[in-house]
Amino acid sequence: MKPKVTLVQIIWSSLMYKYLGVLFILISSDLAAQEIPDYKGEYVFTNSRVSMQGIRELITHNDEGERTIQFNAKFPLGRIKIISDFSETDNRITSTKYYVDVKWTLISDKRTLYFDQASGTLTSKGKFKWSQALIENENVFDPLNVQIQIRKNVIAGLMEFSLMLPDLKTGAIEANNYKVIDNGNFEVDGTNYSCIIVERIRLQDDRTTRYFLAPDLDYLIIKVEDQDQDGDTMLELKKLY
């Protein structure tokens, strides 16, 4: 049983704590005109232990601004599903629910974050159970919908910003700091795209994450590089549908 538990923990930590990152700040009205369109793409996730291919898509459900961003992938003897439900009204993203379902052989691991905006409470169900008060006048994102906000911030011309994310184990809501550091290039399905590179550094985790945004694709994040003491992790877009 020990190898099974170890693999699930590896997959969980890699995807949940390294995969994504960037969120919301109160900024100028320049953002009001920026809309992030729906998309669907094939991504490949790799690190030194795991490689998986999956579909990631952003879906708008109705005119009231209810949206979902999700990632579904398969790997040997298992699968993973990550879903973020949120609403977007007057250019403000409001988190609703964040759900993770990992299955590997006979092991199942489900986790859910509930953002109760009415009561101002954030609750975690699953392996880590906790309840945390949301911060007044601060927008708190989840690990998926934060990437919508990083795109908005870069489109608006922000070079540095700080956004709020919960620690998935403890519930502590922490500021994550981001900075535009460079330009680069990345090839997707035979086309080379110029990119703006945004870096996040978390000193408490000894971790550095870089996001590659392609202006020609509505600033879509087409590559993520993550480095920490456990090694390198990569998420790369292979094809858009």
Predicted regions and their residues:
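Acidic, Ala/Val/Gly-enriched low-complexity intrinsically disordered segments
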Residues: V5-V8
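Sec-dependent signal peptide recognition
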Residues: M16-V22
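N-terminal signal peptide c-region/cleavage motif recognized by signal peptidases
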Residues: S28-S29
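Acidic, serine/threonine-rich low-complexity disordered tracts
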Residues: Q34-Q117, G157-Y241
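Hydrophobic, well-structured mid-protein blocks that either form specific transmembrane helices
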Residues: S108-N153
